[in-house]
């Protein structure tokens, strides 16, 4: 990517495992304006996790694009026990988007990343409802056998989501998973394919 001229911005999160969140972009089609991180509030029962990355930039035809990149708290300990942590992320994100819309009501917004939740789970539903975003990836699939973004014990699932403001959804014809053949491998135990790891 570096040889192709791509650049990146990255958080410096307090994540206990040292994991950060980044956005890779081409400066030929996205002129960076600003980037900041939103740290999730800490609590005694939640270890330090990844920040939400906010990036703004001007795209080639002159509109400003506002991108939030998410890597939500994991499901360690089980979905139900860890759900409150992802709800904290959802509330933090919604507050950030509300603040942006106070300044720019018609902002072009993309929220993308690993939500560690499915499209129908509480945190994703809250974000879509409260921040008035549409999940364009809820029914995405690939062209070479991928039915979602990961496969575990033969079952497909998508914890990765792409959410858009309504002014951008009108521009989207479809959303699909990039499952180029070199990104897949044979699932020898359950049949079919799975993402190469």
Question: Where are the regions a protein language model picked out?
Answer:
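A long, amphipathic alpha-helix that forms part
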Residues: 80-105
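Metal-dependent phosphoester-hydrolase catalytic domains
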Residues: 47, 56, 98-109, 117-197
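Short catalytic/ligand-binding loop motif for oxyanion handling, primarily in non-cytosolic enzymes
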Residues: 18, 75-76, 118-121
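Second-shell loop/turn segments in exported
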Residues: 10-11, 41-43, 76-86, 111-113, ...
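Structured beta-strand-rich core segments of catalytic domains in phosphoester-bond hydrolases
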Residues: 1-73
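Active-site glycine-centered loops adjacent to acidic/histidine catalytic or metal-binding residues
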Residues: 71, 113-114
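A short secondary-structure junction signal
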Residues: 34-36, 77-82, 123
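N-terminal, active-site-proximal structural segment of metallo-dependent hydrolase catalytic domains
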Residues: 1-21, 90-91, 106-108, 186-194
């Amino acid at each position: 990517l570096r040889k192709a001229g791509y650049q990146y911005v990255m958080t410096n999160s307090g994540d206990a495992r040292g994991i950060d969140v980044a956005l890779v972009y081409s400066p030929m089609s996205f002129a960076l304006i600003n980037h900041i991180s939103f740290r999730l509030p800490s609590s005694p029962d939640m270890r330090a996790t990844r920040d939400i990355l906010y990036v703004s930039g001007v795209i080639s035809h002159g509109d400003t694009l506002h991108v939030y990149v998410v890597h939500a708290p994991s499901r360690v300990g089980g979905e139900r026990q860890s759900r409150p942590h992802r709800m904290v992320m959802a509330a933090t994100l919604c507050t950030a988007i509300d603040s942006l819309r106070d300044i720019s009501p018609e902002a072009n917004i993309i929220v993308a990343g690993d939500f560690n939740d499915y499209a129908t789970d509480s945190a994703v539903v809250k974000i879509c409802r409260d921040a008035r975003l549409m999940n364009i990836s809820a029914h995405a699939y690939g062209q070479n056998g991928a039915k979602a973004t990961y496969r575990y014990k033969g079952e497909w699932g998508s914890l990765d989501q792409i959410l858009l403001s309504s002014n951008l959804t009108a521009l989207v014809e479809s959303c699909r998973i990039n499952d180029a053949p070199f990104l897949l491998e044979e699932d020898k135990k359950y049949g079919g394919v799975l993402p190469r790891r």
